[in-house]
Amino acid sequence: MIQLNASVYDIEDDKILFSLVERALNKHLEIVRNKWQRDFDYYNGVGKEPHQTNKAKYIDDMSNSLFISIPPEFSTFNTYDTEAISKNNKKLKLRGFGKALYDVGSNASICGSGFLLTYNKDSDEYPRFVSLDPLRTNVCFNCDVEPDSLFGFTFVQQVEKVNSYEDNTYYKIYVYTDKYMYTLRTISTKNLNVFYYYPIKLEEDILRNKTPHYFGKVPITAFKNNDNETGDSYCVYGLIDAYNHIREDAIKNIDDVIDYILFLKNVRIGNDEELKMFKKLLDEHIIAAEDIDGKGVDAKFLTNPLSQNDIQTMLDSISNDIHTISRVPNFSSEAFAQNASSIALQLKLLGFLNLANEKERCFDQSLIRVLKMINNYLKFIKNDEYTFEVDDIEITYTHNLPSNDTEMVTQIVNLSNVGLLDAKEGLKQLSWVKDYETFYENAKKEQEMQKLVVDNLKKFNNNEREVEPMRKEQMDNLQNFSQGLTSNNDNQSQ
């Protein structure tokens, strides 16, 4: 994210906006060179040391999967908005919002920032969402105490023919303010002077370069991973390098066994002919040499003084430090090899859960911003069926962790028995209940159906009691009929 000394009024002038875009583009490319490219290199296994074990990818992927692999649920305190929010949750699922948000979270876990574009196509009744590449995207803010977004941009690199012998590479830039989307370009990738992408020859060319939108805010929303805007593995880059350096040396040590140097002490080899014979004996794994003045012959290979056990102990120590500092545990370790109670599991995952809670606090405001843009768009197209009061929204995250549902069900039953259970809140705590609103409504319908069946059975039993008792001959006829059925079935079976 980039801060510029400008205001929302400045960007209404195209010339000022273009100059700000040029400054922002230069700053962005500098951020990519100095930081973000390195973050993605570590994630892809291209760090300072050859990555025998890609710890950065494990940390970034695992933390993001814990945090946002299950999309957050939106609910409301207002009963009159409940139906609209339920419809929005379903619509967001159909629009692939969960996948887009997961990709945003993945980028934020890697480099500290992720970007989500809210957009629409012609005649859309509901917005669409896509995650943008941080290496080609950024959002610019003013310098207020509470910075507000001025504009966002994303760009692609393109090539054009200058003549039959020469090509020109340039950036095509999409710039979004709170009112318009601009289509711009640079002269080249080295000359970042900005101007309109389409030549303005006709009146309609202006609309191709400057298209209005109706989200009421800059449609690119920045999602911070933490207050420092760093990735989850950033704090352990040095340890990752040390870990992989030792791993690389250990592998080289094994490969070099065949090239070990033989050290001979107090041995007379002799002339060239005797030396050739000595080498031949070595090839046959035999050593024969003359002792010098009875001083004692000694022969040994020069090897690394560190044994494989010593190296593995050092690797385990560094690995433990990596997972402790990054707060992302190693789930393949012995600590997670046995079944544990819910409390014991939470203690092991305390740092992991704290990391997820920090991400929640950073994502909350960005998600509320996206919901406001959705609401603005729905109000503009007068789709009242989906509109809602954003200030009353509650965001519920479900962390993708192993859980002891048996203990949780016991607690829920105990609360229900003493009359202190909120059914919906109880359902939220169960990992296997994905859509607690739908589950709750279906459960209510099932209870009503069961009650109806029980009531009908009671009525049937009451009616039977009111019927006149059967006479003896009627009972005899019924008994004979039953016996006849039984004997008939026996004959058929024979």
Feature names for model-found ranges:
Residues 84, 93-101, 108, 235, ...:
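Short amphipathic alpha-helical segments
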Residues 1-136, 140, 485-494:
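Extended, helix-rich architectural segments
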Residues 204-344:
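Extended, charged amphipathic alpha-helical segments
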Residues 81-88, 297-300, 349:
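A short, surface-exposed helix-loop junction/capping segment
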Residues 277-293, 310, 317-494:
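C-terminal helix-loop subdomains that flank or include functional centers
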Residues 110, 115-228:
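Extended, regular secondary-structure scaffolds
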Residues 89, 105, 240, 244-247, ...:
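Short, well-ordered alpha-helical packing segments
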Residues 28-32, 39, 95-100, 108-115, ...:
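Short secondary-structure junctions and interdomain/linker hinges
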